[in-house]
């Protein structure tokens, strides 16, 4: 039995459909509906994990997620990363619209999925008329006969169907109904709770001829890497929509929160950004072969829209504050013996939006991460720049959501590093041709390796 949130949404949807039929009768546009030429099923095939990225302004569980919602801007970013793009068209609960479909379709070449509570063939014709290439059919909402009828309409228009299940009974029905792409919703639409175990438990019951998509509650690279053993792809919306920097938000989930440190040239910053990095590191430590001054840093920054982090070691606080301000750094990374008093003083004087990162040297044991006002830790072997790794087995069982891993990371070991569960990786010497000179091919290779799952 459907109850609560879902039942209310479906009851309201029936009212909406009848009103829309009056306003825009099927007969007024059915002759103009052309079959889709973008193949949803094919787009999700292939060796790499697929990503259906979602345009979503609001949801019943979170309210408004994205204030300045602009489907054209979102599509222009998603088209660089997505296998398919999902567009919420439900008005009442998600502040969606069918008008968003052609906007997204015009900008992005990928198949467009109409995400709605579909209960009537009319909605599928409407979706295709507005340029959707696939539609969502939810087995929590439809009985088998309704599903067959709606799927047949979609397939007659050469549209794909994402068949959504949320429990074992619906999964068995999806198998019996011959669903080609099954979305396992980790959110229980009856009470809106999230349980990622649903993907782990249900996905293995589906055959190899079925494409499995894990939906809801996916918001980190560590989750994606782990769940990619169970699912062929992911549908991700809320985790992306809440961020101002959408490029960085997508990269964070697909590749991790990765940084390329020791940038000294604009072309290297561009190569790092093009490869998939989020952060660029600028080193202000005089003894480093990668040290830059403010003018050099500005040249580097002008070349690529990375989020820039300044690296300092036992600097005067006034110097750190000055560079953070002049360069609009997103974070300052402390590599010396800065203690709690130093960090407290710095925090009080820094603008609130500038984060404090602390590098810790790992020897025989893992140092404590108990400093106040530290937003991220960078775990390295020694003082950094050594090109050597520490014993990563020390990270087993640790909570690493605010940790970047550093020390000799390159294409040969970045996957093993990512599998530790750290938020991201910090690349430097192993992506260089000589100290301070990055190699664009090595950078590209590292990020291609990180995305090969």
UniProtKB/Swiss-Prot annotation:
Q: Which Gene3D superfamilies match?
A: Aldolase class I
One of the entry's Gene Ontology molecular-function terms is:
phosphoribosylanthranilate isomerase activity
- Coiled-coil spans in chain: none
Q: What is its EC number?
A: 4.1.1.48, 5.3.1.24
User: What does the record give as the reaction this protein catalyses?
Assistant: N-(5-phospho-beta-D-ribosyl)anthranilate = 1-(2-carboxyphenylamino)-1-deoxy-D-ribulose 5-phosphate; 1-(2-carboxyphenylamino)-1-deoxy-D-ribulose 5-phosphate + H(+) = (1S,2R)-1-C-(indol-3-yl)glycerol 3-phosphate + CO2 + H2O
- Pfam family, any one: PRAI
Give the start-end ranges of region N-(5'-phosphoribosyl)anthranilate isomerase: 258-453
Its domain of life? Bacteria
Gene Ontology biological-process annotations: L-tryptophan biosynthetic process
The pathway to which it is assigned is:
Amino-acid biosynthesis; L-tryptophan biosynthesis; L-tryptophan from chorismate: step 3/5; Amino-acid biosynthesis; L-tryptophan biosynthesis; L-tryptophan from chorismate: step 4/5
Keyword field: Amino-acid biosynthesis, Aromatic amino acid biosynthesis, Decarboxylase, Isomerase, Lyase, Multifunctional enzyme, Tryptophan biosynthesis
Indole-3-glycerol phosphate synthase: annotated span: 1-257
Entry's family note: In the N-terminal section; belongs to the TrpC family.
Q: How does it assemble?
A: Monomer.
Q: Please explain the role this protein plays, according to its UniProt record.
A: Bifunctional enzyme that catalyzes two sequential steps of tryptophan biosynthetic pathway. The first reaction is catalyzed by the isomerase, coded by the TrpF domain; the second reaction is catalyzed by the synthase, coded by the TrpC domain.
| HAMAP family for this protein | IGPS_B, PRAI
Q: Know the name of this protein? A: Tryptophan biosynthesis protein TrpCF
Species for this entry: Escherichia coli O157:H7
